[in-house]
Amino acid sequence: MTDAPAQIVELARSRPRADGAPVVVGITGAVASGKSTFAAEVATAAGTATDVVSTDGFLYPNAELEARGLIAHKGFPESYDVDRLRVFVDEVHSGAPMVMVPQYSHELYDVGGEVPLTLRDDAMVIVEGVNTLGALADQLELGVYLDAAEEDLERWYVTRFLALCAEAENDAASFYRQFTAMTVSEIESLARQTWRSVNLVNLRDHIAPTRALADCVVTKGPDHDIVAIEVR
């Protein structure tokens, strides 16, 4: 299989844009599909002047989700500040020398704080998240969808959930600390229940339909190996 990250970089840089304007690449896919890892690989292939931004930072804070009655739908489209996300991409495209990026902590399970992002000439900004194409398809130079079988996605999610719970044994501030008194079997059962009642629903109802908006579909096999690349 052709080096997928390098192919994504080549495709993105071939897209029309104003001279010197940053290239914005969107990467989406289900929870646990490996978006962050793939985005990091694309950034490495692109070299310097490349940054990765997660849409998780554009989630509403937990307190606001609670107030709106949306905490059970965290990660669904309505739980994101899409206007703020779109303004961010506009600022990147505008040639601004610096933009602010809101941050998210998976350990704390909440947003918090911002960090500055310095944009250099011919920069590439990779925006990754479950809602990237749904929110930004018309603003991207290149939209990428990471595809995988549902049974593989569930297995990857459970593995990640178990790992986060194990790490929480030594981190009292971690959101996952609350599960550490449970047995591994109980944690795995909880993870599968969460996948099927929340993440699978989000995938089928909101994420998978955005596959049609992608310029490129990268299909993964059971071991996160890339088995196909479809360029549209």
Task: Tell where the protein language model's regions lie, with residue ranges.
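NTP-dependent small-molecule kinase module
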Residues: M1-P16, T159-L162, I187-R232
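Short hydrophobic/aromatic beta-strand immediately N-terminal to the Walker A/P-loop
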Residues: V24-G26
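Conserved lysine of the Walker
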Residues: K35
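Post-Walker A helix-loop "phosphate-sensing" segment adjacent to the P-loop in P-loop NTPases
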Residues: A43-V52
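Conserved nucleotide-sensing/catalytic segment adjacent to the nucleotide-binding pocket
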Residues: D51-S54, Y60-V111, M124
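ATP-dependent NMP and nucleoside kinases share a basic, alpha-helical "lid"
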Residues: G112-E169
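Walker A (P-loop) phosphate-binding loop of P-loop NTPases
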Residues: A32
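Hydrophobic positions on the alpha1 helix immediately C-terminal to the Walker A/P-loop
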Residues: F38
